[in-house]
Amino acid sequence: LTPFGAKTTTTPAGKNAHGCLTQKKNVFEIIAAHGLPYAATASVGYMNDFLKKLERAKDIHGTRFIHVIAPCPTGWGAPESKMVDLARDVVDCGLWYLAEYEGEQESGVSGGTFTLNRKPREFTSVRDYLKSQGRFRALSDEEISLVERSRDAKWEMIERDWA
């Protein structure tokens, strides 16, 4: 699930090599589309939220899924001491959201409810978040603007469809 523009350990080497050229799949929404009893997103930067979701999932019968963002010093190209900060920053800049899905299984009809657990009043800088990691070193200003526009479109959908 490599984000747009990120280089990985398997990205071809060379001056002209660029990171991932596609948007990553939203596994949380794919899982929710299958009507599971419970799905959530979490970040190790917001441990209280993560622990609440683990407790919630523990009490639900059936398949449960929690998609956790947990930075990797080697893969992300940042010091180990910054991992929790990065896990918080990705939420605060709006590139990762904290949410839950609770499915309803009545009469064979699947459906469910999405809940946004944290909405930053104002997003922090996407540019600062991306530039703090070696994996995004090659992103141009235009590509960073594309990431920001993609984030804004995603949040418009969340606010429209999950409210």
Predicted regions and their residues:
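Weak global preference for isoleucine
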Residues: 30-31, 60, 66-69, 144-147, ...
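Flexible, low-complexity linker and terminal segments
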Residues: 72-163
